[in-house]
Amino acid sequence: MFEIPRRPVGLAAIALVVVGLVAAGCGSSSSSGGGGQKIALLLPENKTARYETQDKPLFEKQIKADCPKCSVIYSNANQDPAKQQAQAEAALTQGAKVLVLDAVDAASADVIVKRANAQKVPVLAYDRLIPNANIDAYVSFDNERVGKLQATALTQKLKSSGTAAPTITMINGAPTDNNAALFKKGALSVFNTSGVKIGKQFDTPDWSPDKAQTEMQQAITALGNNGFQGVYAANDGTAGGAIAAMTSAGIQPSTRPTTGQDAELAAVQRILAGQQFMTVYKAVKLEAPAAATIAVALSKGQKPPTPPINGTTNNGKKNVPSTILTPVAVTKSNINSTIVKDGFWTASQICTGAYASACKAAGIA
């Protein structure tokens, strides 16, 4: 079983760390400023909007701040494990001094890690832990807690509506994604002790919204329109698919509270419109810079710096130096104090024509 550090660092603490590291540059090391190392950032897919709009630019910005002469070799695998392997090989051939790997799946990631190990190139597992692999660092969120936040919010919402023993549909993430297993584990730890019945449950290949829509259609066929009271969707993409299926079946999404994750713009707007109940906000503005700072150190042959490292995570092979951040549950009531306050999305981005009145009602301006 994978161990999570006991005290994940909160958002404010990591923010202070990153600011301090930028101000200090590369510290007192004789290689301060960097010598033009190449750092590979290998992201898994682009169906989840955050990777291209948040992770990539924030990572590149922090690399430039910490190591002006360093360059980033960027690749996105579009959910194709073979493609990610080829991209990793290409990065190594180009002379990458560290791989920052957000793995498509564990099996292909293990091959990449072994290849990097053979060339003495360190690997930082980004966002998704790579089980049983000889990785050098890990940066992510407390992923079991993500599932617990989702399940707790959904359970409380259903029970506050007068449903003592609700039935739900679970639309989980990709079976090849280690994080998806952790989200599910966290969620089930709540559902199994709360009197919630799981009417239908699915694992969603590739985190595909289209496949999630098909799964939800199957659940509606099996359970009936009135046979479930809520939907656990592991992220905002799968939530969108589930909501589309309910709408097509003549079910008002507002009557079936649906969870999500990633605070995607479309999801935030759905929450304001009452179509989606909640999402989980993960401050990528802290995660990506922390990974960049650690990657610069690894590229120079240095140990992962503490901070931003705040503990270790056992991946089944070793205790991996880790930065674990704290996720935040977001409903309509705290969009303004979390997502907007942090600048993840601006009010002008969220409050387009159709959502202007809902924004005003929620105090977003």
Model features per residue range: what roles?
Residues 20-25:
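C-terminal motif of bacterial Sec signal peptides marking the signal peptidase cleavage site
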Residues 2-8, 26-365:
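A residue-level marker of the well-folded mature domains of exported/periplasmic proteins
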Residues 9-18:
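Sec-dependent signal peptide hydrophobic core
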